[in-house]
Amino acid sequence: MPPFATRPLNSTKSHPIFAQIRRHPFILFGIPFIGIIVGSSFALQAFTQTRYDYQETKVKSVGKEEELGMKSGRRKIDLKEEYYFSMASVSQDDYEPVRVPRPVGVPEWGGGRSGEEAPMKGYRKEDRWV
């Protein structure tokens, strides 16, 4: 008796299904892939529904005005309007411009250029204290 069988282990002739799969690989790869995609879309439907339900509860939550018991129909504050309202009460006739003394070494006429056209603070006789 021979130690090994003469018939090969993976014989395609033993089952006709294996021959069909070899000729049409879509049966082995395509159908399971499409099945997984369709099945997972149904499985994830519950998770997406939970997400939308949670967002809906956040939108329906109580606002700050309702929480504090304030009226929702009150006047909105406009910063520009409040500024003009507060400045209307101040008289412009009482305003007096006061010059702020500049530090020594800063040009008299602003800017970053220092030269003959912009005298430096502290270098002219009228700027000196002593």
UniProtKB/Swiss-Prot annotation:
List the GO cellular component terms.
Answer: mitochondrial inner membrane
Subcellular localization = Mitochondrion inner membrane
* Membrane topology, from the record: Single-pass membrane protein
| Stretch forming the transit peptide | 1-23
Q: What keyword terms does UniProt attach to this protein?
A: Membrane, Mitochondrion, Mitochondrion inner membrane, Transit peptide, Transmembrane, Transmembrane helix
Q: Where is the composition biased (Basic and acidic residues)?
A: 114-130
Predominantly, its location class is mitochondrion
Segments for region (Disordered): 106-130
Single biological process term from Gene Ontology: mitochondrial cytochrome c oxidase assembly
**Is the keyword Protein biosynthesis assigned to this protein?**
no
Transmembrane segments in this chain: where?
Answer: 26-46
Disulfide bonding pattern of the chain: none
Which family does this protein fall into?
Belongs to the COX16 family.
What this chain does, per the entry, is described as: Required for the assembly of the mitochondrial respiratory chain complex IV (CIV), also known as cytochrome c oxidase. May participate in merging the COX1 and COX2 assembly lines.
Q: Could you tell me what this protein is called?
A: Cytochrome c oxidase assembly protein COX16, mitochondrial
